[in-house]
């Protein structure tokens, strides 16, 4: 809202808010990262990610890697007033036989799909649902219907979990 005001546009004139979500998670710095992965699994995703991999642009430091987090993404979309989601770097996941997705958090033995306060977030363990991969290169595919079935199922699963329409996909 304040960005619009600074640009001379009243907030009520904004009709569409596009939130960009990567098909997997990465983070820089410390803090809770519920879906974080480690070791060879993280390194493989890190190296394949983005244009030059998931490394800091200035420092070259490796980013922390994780599976797509539906809980955090749903919360972020809600806070931003999202109307549409652009789902990016979907092609990066094409090497995987199976793709875990974080659909909830287990905190003190209870599962929630709502984003918790910080002290609860720090105790959260991921609840993962595993989807089949598509095992092929999808770069260059322009039409949604031309994507492999399992890729479309992954996108549709995430869309249902976060509760916001994925209207754009980049590969």
Question: Where do the model's predicted regions map?
Answer:
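Non-transmembrane, aqueous-exposed alpha-helical and coiled segments at domain scale
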Residues: 1-171
């Amino acid at each position: 809202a304040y960005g619009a005001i600074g640009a001379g546009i009243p907030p009520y004139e904004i009709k569409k808010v596009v939130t960009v979500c990567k098909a997997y998670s990465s983070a820089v710095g410390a803090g809770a990262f519920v879906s974080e992965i480690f070791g060879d699994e993280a390194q493989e995703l890190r190296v394949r990610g983005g244009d030059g991999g998931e490394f800091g642009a200035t420092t070259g430091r490796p980013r922390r890697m994780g599976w797509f987090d539906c809980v955090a993404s749903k919360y972020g979309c809600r806070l931003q007033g999202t109307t549409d989601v652009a789902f990016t770097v979907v092609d990066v996941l094409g090497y995987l036989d199976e793709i875990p997705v974080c659909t909830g958090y287990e905190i003190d033995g209870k599962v929630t799909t709502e984003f918790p306060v910080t002290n609860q977030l720090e105790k959260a363990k991921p609840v993962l649902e595993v989807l089949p991969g598509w095992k092929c290169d999808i770069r260059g595919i322009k039409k949604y219907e031309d994507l492999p079935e399992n890729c479309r199922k992954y996108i549709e699963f995430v869309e249902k979990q976060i509760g916001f329409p994925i209207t754009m996909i980049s590969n």
